[in-house]
Amino acid sequence: MKINRQRFESLMHELIDENPLACQGILSILRIEYTDQVPSLAVSLEEPPRLLINLDFLIEHTTQEIHVKSVLLHEFLHVLLNHTEQFKQMDRATNIALDAIINHIIHRSQGEDYSEFFRIYYQGQKGYASLLRPDPHGTTTDDRTLERLHLDLLSGSVVVDDLLDLVREIRKEEPAPLQLAPGLPG
C-alpha cells in the first residue's frame, strides 16, 4: 500500500474518531516517531510511551487502509492494557503472548475485517506463534493444548494467569531468550 507520513496520520485520526479504544490509547502517547530502528510498529517500554512507526513495514505488508488501522489499534491496546508499564523488558515469549491476546481482542471487538491483517501476516506461523493469527474458521493442529488456546483466545476466555502459563510454555521451547521490543513481528 502506498503510504507516507501525511496519509498515515490521516488514517490515525480517522481511527481515533471512529474508535474510543484508539482515542484512549493515543492520549497516553506523547510522541510519535518515524524510524527504521523497529521492524514494524511498536510502543516503547517507558513512561510516557512513544509510538514508533516503520513506514516501510506498512508499505510492504498492508494492502488496505483498515490494515493500517488494525496495526495502530494493536499498538494502542498495548498502552491501554498497561503493557508499557507492566513489562520493562520484552522477550519473544512474552511478546507472542501479549500480541496474541491483543490480536484476538481486535478480532472480537472490531470483527473479521480488522483482524484480516493478522490472519494474512501470520498465516505461515507454526506452534505457539500461530496464536498470533485470529482464525475463526479453525486452526488445525495435533497439539491439544495449542488447539484449546486458539479456541479460548477466540472466545475471550484467556485471562492473565493463562497468559503467564503460555509464556512459560513458550520459554520451554525457546533455546535462548530473545530481547525484542513489543511490536508485530513477534
Question: Language model features by range: what are they?
Answer:
Residues 1-69, 75-186:
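Short, functionally important secondary-structure microenvironments
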